């Protein structure tokens, strides 16, 4: 990983869960086996199997737990699990890369795999907007190390610094690139051993995050 760059870990689930039986049909027979819709269980996928009280990660090649009434995972639902880790991979040419949880055909198991996305990305910085007083509006901007309540994060600013892979001996980059709270200038580049005579461009994007609040209530 390139020093002094951010790493973003995204964990989530798919939008099409699997059930013991059709949840819209109260008369459908239930046997405690996750099998609806039929034929959708994928042995090359990881699932989050959870009800309101218990949850677990399970590879699809393994045997899922009993979800029948009276079991630990009674009426649990299986959600396809997603894991993505974005970072700048160090090297002669820095690269925006990501690690994902995916099926490995060679080992016939789930594993963390690396994908290179964009070459020439030297730095990546994230600034988050969050609603600290629960009034529905972003009121605070903060960086990764300063976020304490991730369920309140509702927006994201992304800064990417890209560099050419061709050194121009006649060009000396004297610019300062502001990636949020980090100023990348000639001294910064020299500190991390990056060529100064590369042409660079700073990209910035704002996005809204879907971050619903989940509240679980039990009967008294």
Place the predicted regions along the sequence by residue.
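C-terminal functional modules
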Residues: 207-209
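N-terminal pilin/flagellin-like segments and related low-complexity appendage regions
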Residues: 1-159, 165-199, 204, 216-220
């Amino acid at each position: 990983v390139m020093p002094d760059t951010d790493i973003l870990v995204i964990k989530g689930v798919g939008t099409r869960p699997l059930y013991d039986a059709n949840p819209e049909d109260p008369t459908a027979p239930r046997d405690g086996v996750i099998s609806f819709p039929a034929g959708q269980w994928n042995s090359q996928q990881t699932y989050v199997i959870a009800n309101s009280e218990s949850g677990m990660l399970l590879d699809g090649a393994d045997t899922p737990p009993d979800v029948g009434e009276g079991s630990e995972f009674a009426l649990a639902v299986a959600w396809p699990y997603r894991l993505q880790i974005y970072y700048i991979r160090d090297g002669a040419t820095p690269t925006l890369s990501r690690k994902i949880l995916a099926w490995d055909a060679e080992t016939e198991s789930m594993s963390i795999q690396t994908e290179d996305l964009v070459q020439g990305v030297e730095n990546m910085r994230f600034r988050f907007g969050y609603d600290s007083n629960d009034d529905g509006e972003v009121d605070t901007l903060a960086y990764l190390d300063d976020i304490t309540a991730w369920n309140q994060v509702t927006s994201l600013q992304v800064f990417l610094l890209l560099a050419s892979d061709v050194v121009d001996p006649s060009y000396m980059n004297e610019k300062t690139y502001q990636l949020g709270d980090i100023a990348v200038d000639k001294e910064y580049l020299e500190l991390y051993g990056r060529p100064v005579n590369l042409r660079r461009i700073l990209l910035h994007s704002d996005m809204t995050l879907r971050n619903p609040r989940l509240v679980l209530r039990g009967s008294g």
